[in-house]
Amino acid sequence: MAQTMLLTSGVTAGHFLRNKSPLAQPKVHHLFLSGNSPVALPSRRQSFVPLALFKPKTKAAPKKVEKPKSKVEDGIFGTSGGIGFTKANELFVGRVAMIGFAASLLGEALTGKGILAQLNLETGIPIYEAEPLLLFFILFTLLGAIGALGDRGKFVDDPPTGLEKAVIPPGKNVRSALGLKEQGPLFGFTKANELFVGRLAQLGIAFSLIGEIITGKGALAQLNIETGIPIQDIEPLVLLNVAFFFFAAINPGNGKFITDDGEES
């Protein structure tokens, strides 16, 4: 009898466990497990990645603005690219010519002799022995005066001052008190103007030398021959001309020189 009851209870318990749904089985097993058991059921974790609906627009890289190179200005015979004679070189030659022409006029006013005669007085070399050098000097001066040696680059004037600099505050210095600019050149004499005056001085030296070779007289004496005016009557004009050439030679004009390679000086 006791054995029959045990068998019946075992069959009933087994039948009950077989009819249970599989979802409930982990819970039954969990009831039989102790709380200190290290066995744990795996849990699912869902991770969410945030997505931006509006993304910032990527900025395009700024375009490089290439500065236009200064155009090479060829000389009359297209020699500017060959020997590299720039306007800065021509400006230097023009300054030397202005000093030389002013000194020759001053020397002729004092001694009454032209450039070649003054050179003979200083060196003692006869003119006929220096004829090749003299002809080369005349040719070089003429070619430089007409820009035949080349004129690479260009002169750029300084930018004009703004309206706020037009009114000069009082009490700065003497130039401000006279209504003149505090900084920069006193007069508006640019490097382009200085280049033009230098070319005129080169032409003056060249033609005065040619005239002295032909007539044997200096520049002032040639002027007397052409106009018939005595030198004594035009002394103030001669002195003014000499002073102007000296001042133009030593006065640094405003502006800057830009070559065809973009270099500034």
From Swiss-Prot:
Membrane-crossing segments per the record: 96-116, 130-150, 195-215, 229-249
Transit peptide per record: 1-59
InterPro entries the record matches: Chloroa_b-bind
A single GO molecular function term of this UniProt record: protein domain specific binding
UniProt record similarity statement: Belongs to the ELIP/psbS family.
Compartments (UniProt record): Plastid, Chloroplast thylakoid membrane
Annotated protein name in UniProt: Photosystem II 22 kDa protein, chloroplastic
Source domain of life: Eukaryota
A biological process from GO: thylakoid membrane organization
Sequence repeat start-end pairs: 54-158, 159-264
Membrane association type: Multi-pass membrane protein
